[in-house]
């Protein structure tokens, strides 16, 4: 189980991403449309003034059961440990252990 503070930090990042996503996208679209270098530099400085945690890159995908941040399957939202446990106990519909 991940520490509660780490899970909460990720939740706070998600809130910041939702709050600043429209503003960040507007600036990025304006950068794409602009051809003047001076204007692009000023727009990049506008992006850098936004909170760092409002960037989507800083969000960590975590297991929804344990909060583990590594080896998380995106399709299920589970870490490899919980995926194996739940699949072997038949808790994931449609998942069958392969054998050949």
From Swiss-Prot:
It comes from the Eukaryota. Signal peptide: none annotated. One of its GO terms (molecular function) is rRNA binding. It is found in: Plastid, Chloroplast. PROSITE patterns: RIBOSOMAL_S14. GO terms for biological process: translation. Keywords: Chloroplast, Plastid, Ribonucleoprotein, Ribosomal protein, RNA-binding, rRNA-binding. Its main location: plastid. It holds the Pfam family Ribosomal_S14. GO terms for cellular component: chloroplast; small ribosomal subunit. Belongs to the universal ribosomal protein uS14 family. Part of the 30S ribosomal subunit. PANTHER family: 30S RIBOSOMAL PROTEIN S14, SMALL RIBOSOMAL SUBUNIT PROTEIN US14M. Binds 16S rRNA, required for the assembly of 30S particles. This is Small ribosomal subunit protein uS14c. It comes from Cyanidium caldarium (Red alga).
